[in-house]
């Protein structure tokens, strides 16, 4: 314990000491000094050198020469209790004193004593000096008094002479002798009081005496919680308890001791007391305390003779605490004392003083951030904070290479790796990792073998499992993830025994690889497993079902065939399919037998235990080296064009040599589309119309999205062997003619990426591809009998208008799905004109060349992209705005937890109609695939919630990475606002908001200045918003349609030139209707006869109960999105380019361009006249389509029915302008989607024979003869 300080009254002389205890007030205002605290009317004598070494004498400069010459008057500002009066004291030269007006009995207390801490005292009569025990000695003529320990570390004075303080106790004077004393000081509850120790008669002055020789420490109560004191009647000494008083009377009191022991026999006297024969007690020479015998005195002397470790080198004093020694040494050299100007603390080192000022006083947080204005007490804190603005993250995790701005965050992150009990081994370089995410990052830059060749990390690691999509009656022994109905949408595979989750139904482990466009590779590894085809019973999956059951009643087709280097390869493949299927069954049986022991070692992805791929409980990597060797062998075999033997890790894709011309390319489709099994239509006979349509879409996609989406790895090693779009082959209702999973050539060109050709050049490529036996140019009527069967239609349609995604994802989708079934090596989307016919009757998926797939940098799924923007225009839905911000395509699109999928639920539910139709051979799903809110009981909780439940909000279920985030989030539910402004009592839930409030509102700090008009702002965001206004005002009229305003009314800057607009258009790739215009312009119109041929099938689909949608039942958010896209197309067609400025309130053509992902677009201001004019003007240009072959069935994205206005009704309605504008906007977008969709419908595009507006209006409603789309029937 630290030595406790003592209080002493500064003495005027050796005999006259003042006893005036104090209670220091820590709230000393800055700038006050002792010189300011004198009282004009009360004059004190000049101190005659205080005994304390504290240099206060030089500060005592009395205003008058002598206290005897000073006039004595009674201050009016001091309230005196009615029991007392203030008049001249009986002590000579003391000035005023307190006199009693009534009788005061023993034990009464007066107080508390009001004092103020000071560095020095102006008048010694009205203050006390704080000293430590060791600084007080008997010759200093002061009493030792303990005070609060936290004040004992500093030496300072307290002043009771503050004007207006109301402390009348300061006028209690010091008695000349102890006989005149009638008061004693005591400390109760950290307050100083005077206590009556003698009866005081009326007219008697209150006096205190603290002569140390007369009264010891017991006179003053040392305890903060003082009990009633007891006074000795003989010597007037006070004691804290009655026992001490009795002991004192028996042994110590000189008057009572002799009488006590005279009556006691020798045998009754206390043993060892050693009372002298003369009956005299023993006195301590240091503290003058009396003891009854020598033994007690010796025990007491230990206190005085205790060895003290810290001794002063300038005087004999020693101290128990180093701090006391330092404080004492300051008295020897006052020049080295550094006093704080704001408080009474004194420091020996200037650095300590500076640290004290920064941390304790106003302006302490002197280090301000130049970017955001946040202040810090230390420069190191500011330096660490600046990392936030500079994007510098110096603290990097060595396991997963994630970086942080603060070391504490890195430590918190590392605790996540501690949960990983196993290591994941890179199959290329052998490096071990504790998380799949770190392994995934490593793979991007791994210097080992080629990752993207079919024999590398994307080698099939698991046998393919059959999907129950086509045949629900046959149980699948190897199916483990079908319980939720996810097997219909996501790849199913045997569940490795090493994975911790249940082997029964949970399909979520397969969910992540099933959504590569949703979950980027930064969160998940690129799994080497070969998923099955969910739509078809795969012969590779099940030995009992070696033949592919055709849902359309056609003969079973081989699932894998050879990719020939010549056009003869296709004929050989189709000619040997029966023979090949038989061999394939044997190959798969052998593969399953050999592969099963190595089930848990075949691929890195098998180590993933949750959807995050982070918490791993399995062992892995034991077979990695073997797999790598086998991969290398397989690569060699493929390069040489030799057959590859059936190997356990080959994934069941091995094929006998007799089935093809080049067996080396047999497993290409599966190994490279590790996520995507072949679509249904690819396994059937090819449709020339579908191929032509795909080429049309591919041309547009290549033109606008071409090589720009290829990542660095693709540029070095070729395109990724998987798609980064939504796997529509898992969706039974999706027309796979729109989403072909073509294969790439497996020769050397996998490693060489040729320069992409423009879509027009690609369309001009004449001859058939040597590696693409699939006829991309078969005319619709030629392929129709082989493609469709009357029993089961491929694409159910409900007559509603399902919008095609025209956003960045659509272009990405077009480049991948509709990218023409062309050889992958050229990275083009078509090499033949749509009209060229090559007439190959049948096709095998392995023969289908693969179109380029986008890298995960832009993972926009084909049908998910409208979902991303579905609430983009909902200004009134801030929650949706926040969701949209994080649902936009980006490299870090979703958090790996299942909560990310939970946030997608609302959007995905609007596409609920993608379930299998009850009227088709595909049975309806037992559980909605996207109903993540209420998963069936078969879904295990660990998979759903992961491991950080301790940071889960109990109100809304949100999961946070750290407790601080959860604490702050909970305040949104509880309404707690713990941070209160001291100026205006306004409360905040976040401390940074309070600091910003104080800076901007109360301190009027506006550090952000506009360089154009010198206007200042308190926040950077306000300045940015202001600068946007300058840009808008200074931009030409033609560019005023480029300013994008968000939901707060702020605007984002727009380019100042047309070239900049186009540059931003290419960067953001959000010019939807520019794509529509060019799409239609580059498409050719086809004959209308094929439309009526397929109407019976479409009518048959309309009768399906699960598909009750119509064009008027679109979700409002999707309609809004469609309206926005139409408006952009309107403005593009009128203004001639995509622009970024705010939509003007006038009907002047203006485009809405999304400058930033998280910004809200402005409210729509397009009038009906403007819409009609845009539609009519575009009728002759955009709608004058060239003959274009039809696609397969249109996309049937049925959604939950919501009310929507028909365009014709809106034209005649009397709704207010805002509703009219919004409705027109939605309907216009619907029409735009229908225009794209018309190219994929069986309905051909006719030459324009009606007015443009009528043609558009015909799109909205189902035709009278069927409920299918009737898009632009009469254009």
Swiss-Prot record:
Its main location: nucleus. Residues 610-625 have a biased composition (Low complexity). Its EC number is 2.1.1.367. Residues 680-1038 are annotated as: Interaction with CTBP1, CTBP2 and ZNF516. GO terms for biological process: brown fat cell differentiation; heterochromatin organization; methylation; negative regulation of DNA-templated transcription; negative regulation of granulocyte differentiation; negative regulation of transcription by RNA polymerase II; negative regulation of transforming growth factor beta receptor signaling pathway; neurogenesis. It is an enzyme of class 2 (transferase). PROSITE patterns: SET (PS50280), ZINC_FINGER_C2H2_1 (PS00028), ZINC_FINGER_C2H2_2 (PS50157). Residues 1038-1058 have a biased composition (Polar residues). Residues 1-10 have a biased composition (Basic residues). It comes from the Eukaryota. GO terms for molecular function: DNA-binding transcription activator activity, RNA polymerase II-specific; histone H3K9 methyltransferase activity; histone H3K9 monomethyltransferase activity; histone H3K9me2 methyltransferase activity; sequence-specific DNA binding; SMAD binding; transcription coactivator activity; zinc ion binding. Interacts with CEBPA, CEBPB and CEBPD; the interaction is direct. Interacts with PPARG and PPARA; controls brown adipocytes. Interacts with CTBP1 and CTBP2; represses the expression of WAT-specific genes. Interacts with PPARGC1A and PPARGC1B; interaction with PPARGC1A or PPARGC1B activates the transcription of BAT-specific gene. Interacts with HDAC1, SKI and SMAD2; the interaction with SKI promotes the recruitment of SMAD3-HDAC1 complex on the promoter of TGF-beta target genes. It is found in: Nucleus; Cytoplasm. The lineage of its organism: Eukaryota, Metazoa, Chordata, Craniata, Vertebrata. Residues 1117-1133 have a biased composition (Acidic residues). Binds DNA and functions as a transcriptional regulator. Displays histone methyltransferase activity and monomethylates 'Lys-9' of histone H3 (H3K9me1) in vitro. Probably catalyzes the monomethylation of free histone H3 in the cytoplasm which is then transported to the nucleus and incorporated into nucleosomes where SUV39H methyltransferases use it as a substrate to catalyze histone H3 'Lys-9' trimethylation. Likely to be one of the primary histone methyltransferases along with MECOM/PRDM3 that direct cytoplasmic H3K9me1 methylation. A zinc finger (C2H2-type) spans 230-255, 282-304, 310-332, 338-361, 367-389, 395-417, 424-446, 951-973, 979-1002, 1008-1030. This is Histone-lysine N-methyltransferase PRDM16. InterPro entries: PRDM16_PR-SET, SET_dom, SET_dom_sf, Zinc_finger, Znf_C2H2_sf, Znf_C2H2_type. Residues 631-648, 821-835 have a biased composition (Basic and acidic residues). Disruption phenotype: Mice die at birth but embryos display altered brown adipose tissue differentiation. Keywords: Activator, Cytoplasm, Differentiation, DNA-binding, Metal-binding, Methyltransferase, Nucleus, Repeat, Repressor, Transcription, Transcription regulation, Transferase, Zinc, Zinc-finger. It catalyses: L-lysyl(9)-[histone H3] + S-adenosyl-L-methionine = N(6)-methyl-L-lysyl(9)-[histone H3] + S-adenosyl-L-homocysteine + H(+).
């Amino acid at each position: 314990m630290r030595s406790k300080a003592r209080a002493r009254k500064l003495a005027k002389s050796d005999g006259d000491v003042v006893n005036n205890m104090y209670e220091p007030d820590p709230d000393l205002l800055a700038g006050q000094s002792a010189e300011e605290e004198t009282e004009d009317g009360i004059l004190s004598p000049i101190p005659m050198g205080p005994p304390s070494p504290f240099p206060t004498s030089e500060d005592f400069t009395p205003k008058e020469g002598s206290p005897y010459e000073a006039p004595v008057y009674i201050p009016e500002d001091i309230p005196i209790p009615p029991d007392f009066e203030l008049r001249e004291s009986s002590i000579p030269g003391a000035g005023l004193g307190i006199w009693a007006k009534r009788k005061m009995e023993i034990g009464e207390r007066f107080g508390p004593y009001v004092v103020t801490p000071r560095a020095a005292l102006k008048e010694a009569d009205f203050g006390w000096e704080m000293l430590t025990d060791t600084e007080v000695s008997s010759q200093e003529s002061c009493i030792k008094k303990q005070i609060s320990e936290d004040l004992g570390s500093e030496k300072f004075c307290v002043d009771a002479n503050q004007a207006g303080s109301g402390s009348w106790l300061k006028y209690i004077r010091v008695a000349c002798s102890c006989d005149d004393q009638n008061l004693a000081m005591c400390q109760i509850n950290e307050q100083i009081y005077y206590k009556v120790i003698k009866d005081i008669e009326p007219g008697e002055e209150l006096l205190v005496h603290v002569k140390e020789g007369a009264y010891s420490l017991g006179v003053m109560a040392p305890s903060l919680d003082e009990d009633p004191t007891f006074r000795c009647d003989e010597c007037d000494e006070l004691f804290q308890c009655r026992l001490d008083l009795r002991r004192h009377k028996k042994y110590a009191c000189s008057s009572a001791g002799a009488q006590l022991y005279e009556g006691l026999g020798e045998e009754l006297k206390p043993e060892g007391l050693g009372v002298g024969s003369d009956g005299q007690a023993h006195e301590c020479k240091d503290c003058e305390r009396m003891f009854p015998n020598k033994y007690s005195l010796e025990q007491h002397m230990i206190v005085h003779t205790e060895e003290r470790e810290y001794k002063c080198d300038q005087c004999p004093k020693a101290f128990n605490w180093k701090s006391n020694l330092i404080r004492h040494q300051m008295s020897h050299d006052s020049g080295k004392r550094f006093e704080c100007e704001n408080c009474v603390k004194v420091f020996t080192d200037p650095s300590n003083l500076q640290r004290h000022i920064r941390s304790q006083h106003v302006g302490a947080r002197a280090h301000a951030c130049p970017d955001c204005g946040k202040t810090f007490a230390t420069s190191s804190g500011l330096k660490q904070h600046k990392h936030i603005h500079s994007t510098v993250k110096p603290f990097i995790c060595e396991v997963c290479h994630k970086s942080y701005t603060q070391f504490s965050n890195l430590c918190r992150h590392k605790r996540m790796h501690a949960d990983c009990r196993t290591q994941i081994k890179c199959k290329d370089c052998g490096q071990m990792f504790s998380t799949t995410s770190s392994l995934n990052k490593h793979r991007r830059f791994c210097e080992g073998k080629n990752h993207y060749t079919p024999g590398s990390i994307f080698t099939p690691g698991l046998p393919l499992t059959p999907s129950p999509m086509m045949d629900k009656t046959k149980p699948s022994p190897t199916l483990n993830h079908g319980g939720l109905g996810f097997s219909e949408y996501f790849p199913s595979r045997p569940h490795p025994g090493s994975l911790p989750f249940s082997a029964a139904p949970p399909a979520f482990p397969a969910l992540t690889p099933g959504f590569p466009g949703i979950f980027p590779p930064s969160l998940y590894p690129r799994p080497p497993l070969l998923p099955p085809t969910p739509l078809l019973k795969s012969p590779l999956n099940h030995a009992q079902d070696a033949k592919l059951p055709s849902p359309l009643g056609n003969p079973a087709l081989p699932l894998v065939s050879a990719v020939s280097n010549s056009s003869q390869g296709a004929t050989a493949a189709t000619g040997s399919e029966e023979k090949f299927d038989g061999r394939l069954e044997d190959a798969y049986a052998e593969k399953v037998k050999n592969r099963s022991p190595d089930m848990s070692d075949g691929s890195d992805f098998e180590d993933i235990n949750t959807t995050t791929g982070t918490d791993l409980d399995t062992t892995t990597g034991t077979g990695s080296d073997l797999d790598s060797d086998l991969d290398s062998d397989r690569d060699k075999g493929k390069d040489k064009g030799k057959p590859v033997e059936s190997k356990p890790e080959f994934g069941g894709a091995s094929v006998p040599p007799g089935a093809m011309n080049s067996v080396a390319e047999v497993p290409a489709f599966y190994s490279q589309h590790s996520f995507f099994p072949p679509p249904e239509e690819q396994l059937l006979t090819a449709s020339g119309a579908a191929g032509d349509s795909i080429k049309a879409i591919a041309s547009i996609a290549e033109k606008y999205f071409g090589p720009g989406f290829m990542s660095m790895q693709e540029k070095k090693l070729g395109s990724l062997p998987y798609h980064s779009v939504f796997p529509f082959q898992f969706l039974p209702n999706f027309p796979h003619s729109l989403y072909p999973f073509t294969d790439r050539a497996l020769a050397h060109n996998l490693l060489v990426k040729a320069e992409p050709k423009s879509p027009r050049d690609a369309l001009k490529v004449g001859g058939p591809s040597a590696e693409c036996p699939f006829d991309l140019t078969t005319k619709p009527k030629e392929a129709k009998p082989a493609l469709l069967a009357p029993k089961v239609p491929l694409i159910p349609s409900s007559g509603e208008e399902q919008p095609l995604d025209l956003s960045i994802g659509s272009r990405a989708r077009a480049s991948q799905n509709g990218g023409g079934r062309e050889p992958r090596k050229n990275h083009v989307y078509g090499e033949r004109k749509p009209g060229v016919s090559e007439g190959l009757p049948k096709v095998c998926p392995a023969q289908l060349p693969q179109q380029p797939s986008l890298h995960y940098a832009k993972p926009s799924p084909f049908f998910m992209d409208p979902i991303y923007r579905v609430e983009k225009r909902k200004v009134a839905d801030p929650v949706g705005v926040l969701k949209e911000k994080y649902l936009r395509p980006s490299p870090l699109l979703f958090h790996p937890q299942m909560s990310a999928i939970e946030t997608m639920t609302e959007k995905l539910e609007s596409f609920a109609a993608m379930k299998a139709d009850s009227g088709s051979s595909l049975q309806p799903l037992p559980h909605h695939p996207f109903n993540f809110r209420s998963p069936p009981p078969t879904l295990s909780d660990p998979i759903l919630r992961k491991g950080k439940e301790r940071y889960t909000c109990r109100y809304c279920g949100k999961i946070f990475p750290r407790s601080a985030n959860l604490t702050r989030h909970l305040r949104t539910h509880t309404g707690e606002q713990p941070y209160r402004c001291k100026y205006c009592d306004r409360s905040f839930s976040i401390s940074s908001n309070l600091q910003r409030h104080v800076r901007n509102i109360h301190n009027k700090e506006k550090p952000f200045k506009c360089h154009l008009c010198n206007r200042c702002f308190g926040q950077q965001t306000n300045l940015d918003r202001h600068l946007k206004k300058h840009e808008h005002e200074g931009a030409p009229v033609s560019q005023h349609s480029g300013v994008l305003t968000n939901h707060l009314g702020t605007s984002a800057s727009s380019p100042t030139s047309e070239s900049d607009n186009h540059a931003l258009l290419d960067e953001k790739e959000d010019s939807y209707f520019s794509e529509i215009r060019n799409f239609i312009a580059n498409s050719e119109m086809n004959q209308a006869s094929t439309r009526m041929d397929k109407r019976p099938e479409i009518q048959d689909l309309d009768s399906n109960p699960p598909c009750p949608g119509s064009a008027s039942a679109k979700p409002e958010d999707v309609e809004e999105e469609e309206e926005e896209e139409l408006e952009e197309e309107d403005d593009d067609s009128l203004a001639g380019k995509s622009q970024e400025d705010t939509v003007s309130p006038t009907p002047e053509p203006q485009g809405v361009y999304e400058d930033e992902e998280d910004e809200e677009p402005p409210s729509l201001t397009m009038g009906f006249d403007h819409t009609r004019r845009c539609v009519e003007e575009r009728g002759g240009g955009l709608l004058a389509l060239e003959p274009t072959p039809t696609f397969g069935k249109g996309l049937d994205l049925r959604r939950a029915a919501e009310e929507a206005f028909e365009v014709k009704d809106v034209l005649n309605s009397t709704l207010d302008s805002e509703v009219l504008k919004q409705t027109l906007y939605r309907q216009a977008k619907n029409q735009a989607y229908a225009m794209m969709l018309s190219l994929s419908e069986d309905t051909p595009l006719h030459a324009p024979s009606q007015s443009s507006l009528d043609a558009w209006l015909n799109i909205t409603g189902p035709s009278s003869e069927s409920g299918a789309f009737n898009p632009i029937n009469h254009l």
